[in-house]
Amino acid sequence: DASLEKVINEFSGGEKLPILTFGSVSFDKTEKLMQRFLNKWPEGKKLIIQAGWAGLSLLEESPGILVIGKVSHDQLFRYGSVIIHHGGAGTTASALHAGVSQIIIPHFGDQFLWAREVRRLGSGIRIRRRKWPERIGPAVSFVENSFQMKEKAKELAAILSTEDGRRNAVRELELLHSANIKR
């Protein structure tokens, strides 16, 4: 989307920036959570927030923070220096495909699995949900300054780009279907 690209490039000056998104996760007391987060976000450090279902927003405008609405993660994540998210399978996959390091803050279900996998693969870290607003600043600094994590994220994206996930999924479904017909 050309309009998204224009808005982000004007805001970022062409630099990669941290991106915060919680996808379909919603929170109780979102305003209070965001206030805790903004109180600890490093002064002068730019950030892109995708509002998502959580309705992440600012109580007042901040020149260093851009809040955007619905947009494809595949479009958005290429502008990221680090992706801060909940660890949903789709968001994790999009960040892996984009070749960007991740900070995962899992909330429930398989999000803990994806956080462990990203950490095991060396392309990101996990922060515990309870204190994430207070810990996010140092975590972003750590991940952005980790040459190893950046390189591993790029390496994983290169591997994923050689795979044809759709074709493989169709093949597996066809095999499963034909096995069920033979029963």
Label the model's feature ranges.
Residues D1-V82:
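Donor-nucleotide binding loops and adjacent catalytic segments primarily
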Residues K16-P18, L96-S101, K152:
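Short, surface-exposed connector motifs at secondary-structure boundaries
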Residues E31-M34, E60-E61, A95-A98, A115-E117, ...:
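Short amphipathic alpha-helical segments
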Residues L47-I49, I103-I104, I125-I127:
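Short hydrophobic alpha-helical runs that function as membrane-insertion/retention elements
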Residues I68-E117:
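A donor-sugar binding/catalytic signature common to diverse glycosyltransferases
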Residues E134-R183:
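C-terminal amphipathic helix plus adjacent low-complexity
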